């Protein structure tokens, strides 16, 4: 059996089409959703990511502004910019790109962002809302994974989902979203004994640990849905990336699998755009 491949690019394009229609409808009512992207320093990957986010927002008809601050920016200067954006009625979403230069406290910055403008979904208020099942802004990558599952007719209800990784950005919110959809969820991490045995019990296996091709065929139950969130450089290849899953071996066992690139990655920016529209609606009562 060879697994079906989940096309994240196609689903992301569908999400962006929906967002573009929503933006056009809001603009017809006199409201243009606005996204502010803040980049501190000159990390090459961060410069690419922020440029993509700003460009995508503009392509979908939003108001988008990129603030590129020097690496010498102080915590207070960054805080002042965030507070200024909190007060700006033309900005509905604020994203501060990580990682920040050494000496700057990302957690403190996140806490300063107005929770209604926290389109990354990282503010403690949004984290709490997610875990108690209240409406709020949800982290983009886990939200994108749920959209992929829906697009391919995978209902988590009654299924055993295993999430490998416990980060605040992916692992924990992923578990919360699966719980909301009535899956039985196990979270694995670096201290989990018998990882392969636990993973083999999964109907839905989400790998979000940041280790190159760590998940192999021995970790996967035949017919399982395997979602690979990892983005890892391949040693010896300047521009090649691979996921946390050994795609070639796992594809022979799984029922559905996401590739890297072209799986979860495109969904992250698409869901950021959806969050920005949602934030604009929340702030204006529409």
UniProtKB/Swiss-Prot annotation:
Coiled coil: none
Annotated residues for binding of NADP(+): 165-167, 190, 231
CDD domains per record: NAD_bind_m-THF_DH_Cyclohyd
Pfam families per UniProt: THF_DHG_CYH, THF_DHG_CYH_C
EC numbers for this chain: 1.5.1.5, 3.5.4.9
GO biological process, one term: L-histidine biosynthetic process
Reaction(s) catalysed by this chain's protein: (6R)-5,10-methylene-5,6,7,8-tetrahydrofolate + NADP(+) = (6R)-5,10-methenyltetrahydrofolate + NADPH; (6R)-5,10-methenyltetrahydrofolate + H2O = (6R)-10-formyltetrahydrofolate + H(+)
GO CC terms of this entry: cytosol
Metabolic or biological pathway, per its Swiss-Prot or TrEMBL entry: One-carbon metabolism; tetrahydrofolate interconversion
Keyword field: Amino-acid biosynthesis, Histidine biosynthesis, Hydrolase, Methionine biosynthesis, Multifunctional enzyme, NADP, One-carbon metabolism, Oxidoreductase, Purine biosynthesis
Superkingdom in the source lineage: Bacteria
GO molecular function: methenyltetrahydrofolate cyclohydrolase activity; methylenetetrahydrofolate dehydrogenase (NADP+) activity
Family: Belongs to the tetrahydrofolate dehydrogenase/cyclohydrolase family.
Assembly notes: Homodimer.
NCBIfam families the UniProt entry points to: PRK10792.1 (NF008058), PRK14186.1 (NF010783), PRK14188.1 (NF010785)
Function summary: Catalyzes the oxidation of 5,10-methylenetetrahydrofolate to 5,10-methenyltetrahydrofolate and then the hydrolysis of 5,10-methenyltetrahydrofolate to 10-formyltetrahydrofolate.
Protein name: Bifunctional protein FolD
